[in-house]
Amino acid sequence: MSEEKQTAEQVEAAEQEEVTEQAEQAASQEQHEETAGQEEALQHQIDELQGLLDEKENKLLRVQADFENYKRRSRLEMEAAQKYRSQNVVTEILPALDNFERALQVEAESEQTKSLLQGMEMVRRQLMDALEKEGVEAIEAVGQEFDPNLHQAVMQVEDENFGSNIVIEELQKGYKLKDRVIRPSMVKVNQ
């Protein structure tokens, strides 16, 4: 009986060992499945965070580009404002300059009138010098090809002495401030 008892105990121990082994395997499999689930959840979180990071980086790049464009635009506007700061004053002075030129076209009959015209010419010259220092220059018109950016045609005539589309007379001087036309020349153009 002692052998039978030992055998029964061995069988029971073997069965218990098998049950324990199966329980350990089940627990290990559950733990593995749980770990795999956690890994999957963590990978999903990583993917979401990476997507969010990419989105924020793109937004940052757009904001930086917008800011650079703003700085460039502001700089260009400041440069233009500095370059053309005197445009309003020049525009207001041009009619007075036109009047000087009209007055200087008068024929001087007496010494007093000649003296007055010389004084007016000196004032006109000083005024023109000051304007030129600011970058104002008269637009060349007579003999030039008509350019709608520089000239305003107020009359058209036919004259065989001039080519087609050539300015033959300037009725009012035009002026540029640096590279910007502030007043186009009023001209007579040959057809």
UniProtKB/Swiss-Prot annotation:
Comp. bias intervals (Basic and acidic residues)? 30-49
* Record region (Disordered): 1-49
> What keyword terms does UniProt attach to this protein?
Chaperone, Cytoplasm, Stress response
Function according to Swiss-Prot or TrEMBL: Participates actively in the response to hyperosmotic and heat shock by preventing the aggregation of stress-denatured proteins, in association with DnaK and GrpE. It is the nucleotide exchange factor for DnaK and may function as a thermosensor. Unfolded proteins bind initially to DnaJ; upon interaction with the DnaJ-bound protein, DnaK hydrolyzes its bound ATP, resulting in the formation of a stable complex. GrpE releases ADP from DnaK; ATP binding to DnaK triggers the release of the substrate protein, thus completing the reaction cycle.
Enumerate the Pfam families for this protein.
GrpE (PF01025)
Q: Which GO terms describe its cellular component?
A: cytoplasm
Q: Give me the stretches of Acidic residues compositional bias.
A: 12-21
Give the family from UniProt.
Belongs to the GrpE family.
What is the gene name?
grpE
Q: Where in the cell is it found?
A: Cytoplasm
Q: What is this protein called?
A: Protein GrpE
Please give the organism: Bacillus velezensis (strain DSM 23117 / BGSC 10A6 / LMG 26770 / FZB42)
Q: Which GO terms describe its molecular function?
A: adenyl-nucleotide exchange factor activity; protein homodimerization activity; protein-folding chaperone binding; unfolded protein binding
Chaperone among keywords: yes
* GO terms classed as biological process: protein folding
